[in-house]
């Protein structure tokens, strides 16, 4: 039984609203239907798929990063994304892949999770 696709990532947070706003503003993810769990949270959607689950109600001391280094999203609008990051005062690292030329932008969300956004090689800064 091979895996056929990545289904979702889950972010643990002590501030659900700030996390929803962050991913909505920078990645265009939108809250959508979520089962009636007994804990606070949200499911954030891209193209009608719940790709990011936000789980709240845990004090910061209980949050953990585990062994996952980062989550990556295929995106478009490199220049606009960099402008948003700069306007928010968020540090980022913008790199170009050798040979392929694809752009990678790394930054951290309000919970400390590392996010990568990937852009086509023909985009400009």
List each model region and its residues:
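Conserved beta-strand in the GNAT
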Residues: 52-55, 116-118
